[in-house]
Design a protein with these regions (language model features):
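N-terminal leader/linker segments that initiate helical-solenoid repeat arrays
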Residues: 1-40, 369-389, 398
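The tetratricopeptide repeat
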Residues: 4, 37, 70, 101, ...
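Structural register within alpha-helical repeat arrays
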Residues: 8, 38-41, 74, 105, ...
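Residue at a conserved register position within TPR or TPR-like alpha-solenoid repeats
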Residues: 12, 45, 78, 109, ...
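Structural motif corresponding to the intra-repeat A-B loop/turn of tetratricopeptide repeats
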Residues: 15, 44, 48, 77, ...
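Alpha-helical positions within canonical tetratricopeptide repeat
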Residues: 19-20, 49, 53, 66-69, ...
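Solenoid-like repeat scaffolds
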Residues: 22-32, 43-46, 55-65, 76-79, ...
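Catalytic glycan-binding domains that act on GlcNAc-containing polysaccharides
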Residues: 30-32, 39, 54-61, 201, ...
Length: 614
């Protein structure tokens, strides 16, 4: 059949077996087929003249998968026979991916005598790419007017922050002895190599304030559990940080430790000085400062300024609802009900998020309004590109090339940014019977405020949920696997409910069912029966408390028991459940509990009023 021949053709092309591909009989013309074969061919192509074909393909198909591999392939084919102007033109559109390509760019700039761009290219290579001993020596010798001792140190500093041992040591001949001592101390601390004290002693006093050394000492102490000793280093940290994310990870660990010790004043001081400027870590740091000020230092006014500033600078529904809900709580605690109500109303607009839903309750509303499906927007730019990827995915599924089809749909999802672009992806995913890819696309769209409720919250038939509420099962499955029955995590958790084989085996034994590991990913009912049974045992253990059972499903009951001991039991009146969730020490579990609970609110709404899911 055509399908089998097409399947064979793609298999040969994936392997780069062009002789067998040429020998295929009856390979009828098909537009999708020809384009996929061309794409696969260009990825493997080693002939010089295919450079132009790759450049054309990239220009005409901006959203195709594995764009970077195609760019790297083109870089390989940029031969010295090409005119320098062509080479420079290429790199002005595609920054070099490999060290070798970077050298080709530099050579072309030399030939055309473009000194300004040459200097930029040399510095960018020097500061961002892994180089051999020979390449380093060559650059230092040839470009010593640009690669000054200070620039040489900047490269070593970058390699040390990355933790690259060999590449750092390759730089030793080019730096001073004192800088070598500093580098050695940083590497020893970073990789827990031992003999750190003598290594630090060898660093001269004027270099001991080096950001990287302070950071590695701080992190080393925290890893060794020396939290008090680590804290001494926080008070004279540089105001400008090169790698703010790394600093925040350590600072957050210290703040959480202080909260555990009920040392709220110091925790607040450390949180206030977080120095984050943007992105996810800014949102987390700014929120933490506000929350500690409000809940543990009784400073509602100060807290509200943190939350309002956070609201202005974050973009995702999860962060905006979190900032506005807590701003409402801060104004409420400061006896300013009208302003508090205003902020709860802002938060409640984000009705698919945990804090948006809590704000809705704060406003005394029992009904939960889900976002309406948007009308088709005018921003349809790029929709034809996306539709093409979807049609190719459908074609690939029909000929039995599912893995490749998934790659095309996921790439389409990552590039889609409007309703008109996301809509065909969801239809395509449902058409090829991969609802988990529709969930994937719909969830990505929701971050941009584009909602597809029924695709985002599927309700497949469930046979046996062991008396556990269906809405809860769906909520866990959505967070665990996005409804992908074949999901497998890097830790080895399997299937819809992401069961660890050992857990699944003991549950099967208690239910007197035969245990079959393969069935965890091949039979979704089997996976749900075991997962629901395990979940039910957790709900019983925690006397009906969903938040505790959900936390235990993610982090294990031994951790939840530890947290109950430490922070109290949120099922009792004197312990605030929201604070309890926010005090969970593991970021992954905090996020997990909030995401499952927000799913639960939506699923209950969809199950009780099926019409709202249109």
């Amino acid at each position: 059949s055509h399908s089998q021949i097409y399947n064979k053709a793609i298999t040969f092309a994936e392997r780069g077996d062009w002789i067998k591909l040429k020998g295929l009989k009856h390979l009828n013309k098909n537009t999708h087929m020809e384009k996929v074969l061309l794409w696969l061919k260009l990825r493997h192509s080693t002939t010089r003249d295919s450079f132009g074909s790759i450049a054309r393909f990239l220009k005409q198909n901006p959203y195709w998968p594995e764009r970077n591999q195609l760019i790297q392939q083109a870089e390989l084919l940029l031969s010295s026979k090409r005119s320098p102007t062509n080479v420079i033109n290429w790199f002005s559109k595609h920054s070099p991916k490999t060290t070798e390509a970077h050298f080709k760019w530099i050579k072309a700039l030399e030939v055309t005598n473009d000194k300004e761009n040459l200097d930029k290219a040399v510095l960018s290579l020097w500061k961002t790419k892994i180089l051999s001993q020979r390449q380093q020596r060559f650059l230092i010798k040839k470009y010593k007017r640009i690669i000054t001792p200070e620039i040489i140190w900047q490269r070593l500093d970058w390699l040390l922050w990355k933790g690259y041992i060999r590449s750092s040591q390759r730089m030793y001949p080019h730096v001073t002895q004192n800088q070598r001592h500093l580098a050695e101390a940083r590497l020893r601390l970073r990789h827990l190599m031992g003999a750190v004290d003598p290594a630090i002693k060898r660093v001269p006093l004027e270099l001991r304030k080096d950001d990287g050394l302070v950071f590695e000492r701080l992190r080393w102490r925290q890893r060794k559990g020396m939290m008090e000793k680590a804290r001494e280093l926080y008070w004279n940290i540089p105001g400008e940080q090169k790698y703010p994310r790394l600093w925040w990870r350590e600072r957050a660990r210290q703040i959480r430790y202080l909260l555990k010790q009920n040392n709220f004043d110091t925790a607040l001081l450390l949180a206030q000085r977080h120095l984050q400027k943007e992105g996810r870590y800014y949102a987390e740091a700014q929120w933490l400062a506000g929350w500690i000020a409000l809940r543990y230092a009784d400073k509602p006014e100060q807290a509200s300024t943190y939350f309002l500033e956070m609201y202005d600078r974050v973009r995702t529904p999860v962060s905006r609802s979190r900032a506005s809900y807590w701003a409402g709580r801060a104004f409420e605690q400061n006896n300013n009900s009208p302003i508090a109500k205003k902020w709860f109303e802002v938060a409640a607009r984000y009705s698919t998020t945990f804090y948006g839903q809590l704000a809705n309750k704060k406003l005394g509303k029992t009904e939960h309004r889900l976002p309406k499906k948007q009308s088709n927007d005018s921003k349809a730019d790029g929709a034809p590109y996306i539709s093409e990827l979807v049609n190719i995915a459908i074609f690939l599924t029909e000929i039995g090339k599912t893995d490749l089809a998934i790659k095309f749909l996921k790439t389409a999802s990552r590039n889609a940014s409007s309703y008109a672009q996301v809509s065909p992806i969801i239809s395509g995913a449902l058409k090829i019977n991969k609802p988990h890819l529709a969930v994937y696309a719909a969830r990505r769209a929701a971050r941009k405020g584009i909602y597809f409720i029924s695709a985002s919250y599927p309700k497949p038939a469930l046979n046996d949920t062991r008396q556990v509420e269906k809405a809860l099962i769906y909520s866990i499955v959505r967070q665990e696997s996005n409804f992908d029955p074949q999901a497998e995590s890097y830790k080895g958790a399997l299937g819809l409910m992401q069961l660890m084989p050992a857990t699944a085996k003991s549950v099967a034994k208690s239910l007197r069912l035969n245990f079959n590991q393969e069935k965890l990913t091949s039979d979704h009912n089997y996976n749900i029966t075991l997962g629901a049974s395990y979940l039910r045992s957790l709900i019983e253990k925690y006397e009906g408390s969903y938040p505790l059972a959900i936390a235990a499903y993610n982090a294990g009951p031994h951790n939840v028991d530890k947290w109950i001991k430490r922070f109290g039991n949120p099922t009792q009146n004197d312990v605030d459940l929201i604070d309890w969730i926010e005090r969970i020490p593991y970021g992954e579990t905090r996020n997990y509990v909030q995401r499952v609970l927000e799913n639960l609110t939506i699923y209950r709404e969809l199950i009780s009023k099926p019409t709202t899911s249109k």
